[in-house]
């Protein structure tokens, strides 16, 4: 199995578009937090939207909107590199007309959930992650799965509880929200598999759909994390031949 950085994009350890967007999301959140502290008022999705529009510039695309260009990440030449960004993220950001407005599409792809991990370390993680993912993904599954992911990470960070227990608590808090049905169903399913001792492998993961949409990516990532008793075991899962578009795990 893989034990070190693998060659990609002509070098070892090059970051993907997923990582690029996660970094720009974190930059937007930090700027929003500072603005909130300084002024007492801030529309977080709008500030994150500025950051994602700066990422769009690094991909060689001039957005319709005019984002603030004084960010730190945009000054890093290594990030001015086109990877393989998803069409939904590109088109939603290219077509945006108002900062902070949700995307006008019905996509539930994993391009929202894969970038919201930084939301776990800021106030109101579920709401902030959902609103951030909704900037590019308009289907409730696309953005509510992102909210649940950030909420789970936040609870793991704040509470010394097993992952399975944290997932149950997060579902109790948010699983009944309108539009959460697909995500709740799939996450509850992998919880049952874990409780029954069923471990993930490439074939079983493929049966879940492969992780190309948000609820699948989250459920697969949680299943692998639940099954891995150690970092080494998790590494084996990641190198078992499974490939998806998402970096949720």
Question: Which residues fall in each region the model found?
Answer:
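Structured, active/binding-site neighborhoods that engage oxygen-rich ligands
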Residues: 1-249
């Amino acid at each position: 199995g893989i034990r070190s950085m693998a060659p990609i994009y002509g070098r070892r350890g090059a970051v993907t578009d997923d990582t690029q967007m996660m970094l720009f999301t974190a930059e937007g959140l930090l700027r929003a937090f500072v603005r909130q502290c300084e002024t007492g008022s801030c529309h977080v999705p709008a500030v994150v939207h500025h950051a994602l529009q700066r990422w769009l510039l690094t991909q060689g695309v001039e957005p319709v909107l005019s984002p603030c260009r004084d960010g730190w990440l945009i000054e890093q030449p290594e990030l001015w590199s086109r990877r393989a960004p998803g069409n939904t993220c590109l088109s939603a950001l290219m077509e945006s007309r108002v900062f902070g407005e949700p995307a006008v599409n019905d996509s539930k792809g994993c391009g929202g959930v894969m970038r919201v991990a930084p939301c776990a370390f800021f106030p109101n993680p579920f709401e902030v992650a959902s609103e951030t993912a909704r900037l590019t993904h308009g289907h409730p599954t696309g953005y509510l799965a992102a909210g649940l992911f950030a909420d789970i990470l936040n609870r793991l960070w704040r509470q010394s509880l097993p992952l399975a227990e944290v997932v149950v608590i997060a579902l109790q808090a948010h699983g009944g929200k309108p539009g959460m049905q697909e995500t709740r169903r799939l996450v509850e399913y992998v919880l049952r598999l874990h409780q029954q001792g069923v471990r993930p492998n490439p074939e079983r993961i493929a049966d879940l759909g492969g992780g190309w949409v948000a609820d699948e990516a989250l459920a697969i990532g949680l299943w692998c994390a639940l099954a891995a008793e150690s970092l080494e075991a998790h590494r084996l899962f990641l190198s078992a031949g499974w490939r998806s578009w998402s970096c949720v795990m």
